[in-house]
Amino acid sequence: MASPTLLRTFGSTLAALLLLTTCARAVPSIRYSWDACDPVVLDHEFVGPGHYVQTLSVTGLVLPFTSFEAHIAIGPGLFSAWAFYNGACQGAGRMTVSTAAGGCQTIPGLLVTANVVPGLTDPTAHLYVTASVPAGFTPDPTARYTLLRIDFDHTATTTGSLDPPGHCGSGDLPYCFGIESMAINAHSLPGRDFDVENGVLTWNLASTPGQCPFRVAVRPSTWGRLKSIYR
């Protein structure tokens, strides 16, 4: 029969191993939301010209944290209201990014770039985000940090399918935003390298927030192919 001391030692060792296993399984958790980081807002309605904001945030960060990438599909269709790319109705200049958002801490020195590119073979736009983190940042695993705050300037957006002079129509149409792929420190396997709390946002779909009724090209398997095309 095992002695009480041996049982206590075994119990302590088992508890430590379980704790280590739990910690090893813990991965950063990504949140995608309209407006601020918290609370989560899954749908936004077009209520008139103005600025509309989306955020990507993360909790559970541990060292090292050096880079972040995200690809987001926008669709269906390439309508004027969401044509935030060169040569289109809104143009690239009406979309701006920053690294601070309500409900989140900031990552000192975080550098973020983002651009929208129309699909080559599908009627979908693609938002590409890249970010780099300078050396010396020590994250708090319990804190939520802003990865991206993106401001869509819809001051020239209007309703209806036509584009009046100086304006971009179709602001009242339903739209979806779906995370195609993501990477932290160049590692891009969901469930192992990170978790995604919610991967879809909707626009003008208040009855089904965060649930896209359309076929939008959200294909994590295309991660490598997309990088090879657009880099």
Segments the model singles out, each with a brief description of its role:
Residues 35, 87, 102, 166, ...:
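Extracellular secreted precursors and ectodomains with disulfide-bonded cysteine-rich loops/domains
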Residues 190-216:
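A recurrent domain-boundary module in secreted/ectodomain proteins
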Residues 27-108:
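Low-complexity, serine/threonine/proline/glycine-rich extracellular segments that form mucin-like
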Residues 2-13:
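Bacterial N-terminal signal peptides that target proteins for export
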Residues 22-48, 208-231:
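Boundary/junction segments of secreted and surface-exposed precursor proteins
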